[in-house]
C-alpha cells in the first residue's frame, strides 16, 4: 500500500499550488461591466496512491452587482432569470467570502502556498472571478492573479478535443446536454475531466517523483 508521502500530495504534484475548479455563468463577456450570475467551485484532493479526485463543492446564485449590464442574448443562452426569487441569490461579497474561506483552509490543510484556478477556457472564468474580487475588496484573494490550468488546452493535447462536451465523452465521462450551462454541472464535469487528465498522465508514467527542495513558490 502506497504511503501518502511528499510525492502523493497536491503540494508536490502542482508545485505548491492548490487547484480549485471554477465555473461561472454571466450576463455577458465583459467581466468589468457584465453581471456575474452564478459560480460553482470544486476543490480537489489526492489519495494515498497519488490519484486525484474531487473533494468539496460550493455553489452560489449571485445578485447582479449595482450598475451591471445584463446582455439579453447571454440570458437566453444560459437560461438564467436574474429576477427569479427562487434563485435565492446572494451578493458577490457573500459568495466570494465563503469561497475564499474554504479555499484558504484547503491551502493550509494541504500545505500549499496559493490556489490556482482550473476551468474550461480558463481565461473567461478567471477574469470574472478577479473582477468580482476587486469589486468586493475582500482581502487576501487566495487565487493566483494570472496563472491557471485550462482544461480546454489540456484536452486538446491529450484527447484531441477542446469542447467540454466532446472532451468529456472522449474521456469516458457522461455528459447531459440538458444540464449544460449550469455553473454547478459544468464545474462538476470539468473537475472530473481535470482529474482524468492528471490521472491518465500518471498511469502513462508521465509523473515522476520530486523532492521537497524542488518545489518553489511563484
From Swiss-Prot:
Q: Which cofactor does it need?
A: Mg(2+)
> Which GO molecular function, any one, fits this protein according to its record?
magnesium ion binding
**Family annotation (InterPro entries):** Exonuclease_RNaseT/DNA_pol3, RNase_T, RNaseH-like_sf, RNaseH_sf
One GO process term, biological-process aspect: tRNA processing
Annotated residues for binding of Mg(2+) 2: 23, 25, 181, 186
Cellular component, GO annotation: cytosol
What is the protein named?
Ribonuclease T
